[in-house]
Amino acid sequence: MSNVMRTPVVEKVIVHMGVGESGQHLVDAEEILRNITGQEVVRCFAKRTLPAFSIKKNEPIGCKVTLRGQRAQQFLETALGIVDKTLVRSQFDSLGNVSFGIEEHTDFPGMKYDPNIGVFGMDVTVVIKRPGERICKRRIATRKIPTNHRVTLEDSIAFLNDSYGVEVM
């Protein structure tokens, strides 16, 4: 694109592991996520009690990491390589964001299977935006983003295809 303000960029990449229980299983998942991303992990808590799954409200049941900047781009390149740079159109939302799953943490380079820990999967969410979208989030002089400046599904597919060589089916 000729206009720099119209070129989409990766705002952030969120890597999430839903374990479903607290305890040693969650601690193992946090350690794996810390090793893969090289960044501190944040715990996710249950929003409500689910007796069928023995989950209580505010119990830690998952963990996540938010990557930005160069770390996000490097992780995204690796994660897309694991899924063979192929995504399905249903993995995109109307705002141009994309989410996909990675079934085994052992697919990442340098990660080996440990029988004491087991195998963990993870969800990767990529938020794509255009420069200037801060105007809708800032405190002073908040404005709406014009419709023609919002990232659409087609824009994000074209961006991922051009920047990362992703094929969308």
Curated annotation (Swiss-Prot):
Q: What are the annotated GO cellular component locations?
A: ribonucleoprotein complex; ribosome
Q: Name one GO biological process term.
A: translation
What are the entry keywords? Ribonucleoprotein, Ribosomal protein, RNA-binding, rRNA-binding, tRNA-binding
Give the residue spans that cross the bilayer.
none
Q: Which Pfam families match?
A: Ribosomal_L5, Ribosomal_L5_C
| SUPFAM superfamilies in UniProt | RL5-like
Q: Which PANTHER family match?
A: 60S RIBOSOMAL PROTEIN L11-RELATED
| NCBIfam families assigned to the protein according to its UniProt record, in alphabetical order | PRK04219.1
Subunit-structure text: Part of the 50S ribosomal subunit; contacts the 5S rRNA and probably tRNA. Forms a bridge to the 30S subunit in the 70S ribosome.
What job does this protein perform? This is one of the proteins that bind and probably mediate the attachment of the 5S RNA into the large ribosomal subunit, where it forms part of the central protuberance. In the 70S ribosome it contacts protein S13 of the 30S subunit (bridge B1b), connecting the 2 subunits; this bridge is implicated in subunit movement. May contact the P site tRNA; the 5S rRNA and some of its associated proteins might help stabilize positioning of ribosome-bound tRNAs.
**Name of the protein in its database record:** Large ribosomal subunit protein uL5
Instruction: Tell me what organism the protein belongs to.
Output: Methanosarcina barkeri (strain Fusaro / DSM 804)
The encoding gene is: rpl5
